Design a protein with these regions (language model features):
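Mobile-element integrase/transposase regions
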Residues: 1-35, 41, 53-62, 66-71, ...
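RNase H-like two-metal-ion nuclease catalytic core shared by retroviral integrases
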Residues: 73-93, 97-123, 129-137, 146-148
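Short small-residue beta-strand/loop micro-motif enriched in glycine and branched aliphatics
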Residues: 40-45, 98-100
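Short, solvent-exposed cationic patches
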Residues: 61-78, 243-244, 274-282
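A short acidic/small-residue loop/turn micro-motif
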Residues: 48-52, 260
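Active-site-proximal acidic segments at structured loop/helix or strand boundaries
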Residues: 121-220
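Mobile genetic element proteins and their domesticated derivatives, centered on retroelements
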Residues: 17, 40, 60, 73-76, ...
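Protein C-terminal end segments and domain termini
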Residues: 208, 212-215, 219-286
């Protein structure tokens, strides 16, 4: 018989996934978590109000800064995990990003078991709250979410990491430390500059014959002009970053919102509707 797969060393493989959490002020929460496959240590975690790449980064970036860079990260095909941003971040740090085959959850048993533990030992103690509950307690949504993350971190560090795991016979923290002692070195931590570079949002554009680049309906003038050259746009930095040194000047900004931002609804016209005659005597209202 073949036993279940397990990474031989710490930071050989991280497994990531998202879990639906409690309602905070009538808003749904999601837990992003990353588990070291060898030790079962929770290397990164964060509750957020959306299941997107922004909240994914909030869990992954501190994990890399504190626990080091893994050789591989194994995730499913959720929208946040297949985003090009995650692929770019992993490539910048030399991490192999692996997605499970659709409908085949093999290799995800450890993170799923951890989520069962979260439900049975942590979430059972957390009560859903409404907006009225937060108002009565004098807390806003941000403060309530921070408190949820604080409580979860305390549970992970004082309970989960120190309890003996039934499969390994060691606590996750003990197995993590023992693994590095056996390897004879500590985790390789990325520099702050490398992390910042890896987690930039990036878009590529080609310079037009008029020496401009366009991004989200905004036009930027390139100086010096390089028609046909490829430029990469990165955020949070507010500059265009080409493969060669130059600057880009914003010359036309008809749009002030990102494409994912919700557009305001149009107010109804207060003027009364008037009938408009069409052919064959029909009347429509506008």
């Amino acid at each position: 018989m073949f036993g279940r797969f397990e990474a031989a060393d710490p930071n050989e493989l991280w497994v990531g996934d998202a879990l639906h959490g409690p309602r905070v002020g009538d808003r749904k929460t999601y837990l992003f978590a990353f588990l070291d496959d060898h030790s079962r240590l929770v290397v990164g975690h964060r509750f957020g109000f959306a299941e997107d790449t922004v909240r994914l980064a909030a869990a992954l970036k501190p994990a890399l800064a504190a626990r080091g860079v893994p050789a591989s990260i194994y995730v499913d095909n959720g929208s946040a995990f297949v985003d090009a941003w995650l692929l770019r971040a992993c490539a910048k740090l030399g991490i192999r990003l692996v997605h499970s085959a659709p409908g085949r959850p093999q290799g995800r048993g450890k993170i799923e078991r951890f989520f069962r533990t979260v439900r049975g030992q942590f979430l059972v103690e957390v009560t859903d709250t409404t907006t009225e509950d937060l108002a009565a307690a004098g807390v806003d949504h941000t403060g309530a979410l921070l408190e949820l993350n604080r409580l979860f971190m305390a549970w992970v560090e004082t309970e989960y990491h120190r309890r003996t795991h039934t499969e390994t016979g060691q606590s996750p923290l003990e197995r993590w430390d023992t693994g590095w002692d056996r390897l004879g070195h500590t985790p390789e931590l990325p520099t702050a500059a490398d992390l910042t570079e890896a987690f930039l949002w990036s878009e590529f554009r080609v310079v037009t014959k008029t020496a401009t680049v366009s991004l989200h309906s905004n036009t930027y003038q390139v100086d010096p002009p390089w028609p046909g050259a490829a430029w990469s746009w990165c955020s949070p930095r507010s500059t265009c970053r080409p493969s060669r040194s130059a600057t880009a000047t914003r010359v036309s900004v008809p749009r002030h919102r990102t494409p994912s931002a919700a557009m305001p609804t149009r107010k109804p016209d207060p003027r009364p509707s008037r009938p408009r005659r069409q052919r064959r005597g029909s009347i429509t209202w506008r």
